[in-house]
Amino acid sequence: MATVADGFRYAERVVSGDIVAGELVRLACQRFFHDLEHGPERGVYFDEGRAQHVLDFYNFVPHVKGHLTGKPIELMDWHTFILINLFGFVVPLIDEITFESILDDDGDPMFVRRFRTAYDEVARKNAKSTLSSGIGLYMTGADGEGGSEVYSAATTRDQARIVFDDAKRMIKLAPKTLGRLFGSNKLNIHQERTGSKFEPVASDANNLDGLNIHCGIV
């Protein structure tokens, strides 16, 4: 089972040189530690609970290809590092008119994810589509967003279906866990309880206007 500590350890090994990595990866790891130390000075915080929540979700996400088909995914440390960055760092939710922090019913500040966009470039056969499919499912039904709209987009609909079809197969292979959270058909994955959906779309489609996107995977 992946833990936040695995992501920390990966970043430490990259910074120390134990893991050979490109410049952008090294900079990302250095930024990670800098933000942990200095982020609160500018309103950036790391929420370990949020980070661990998405990692725990992957305990129910199965492999969909190869000899490991049906078995739970074991996230590699670099997968974990990506996920805790995206889901762990938060900033206060600010009112766009008053520029003041928005408070919850208990009078505490509400927080939202710091990062709204991420770019991930890896070599083939490194489970990029699998990781993306898991993120798509998480954002559809485990992120606490009612009416969540998640889209897998590409130049053509067939390309967009790669991540989507993997996500559908994950649900089929995990009927006692993911199968209880989601329903699926040819057009979408959905969660009736929250009115959320996950669909593939082509970038040249005529129906892209007006989408209220909670998560887009391109």
Predicted regions and their residues:
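Phosphate/NTP-binding elements of NTP-utilizing enzymes
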Residues: 2-218
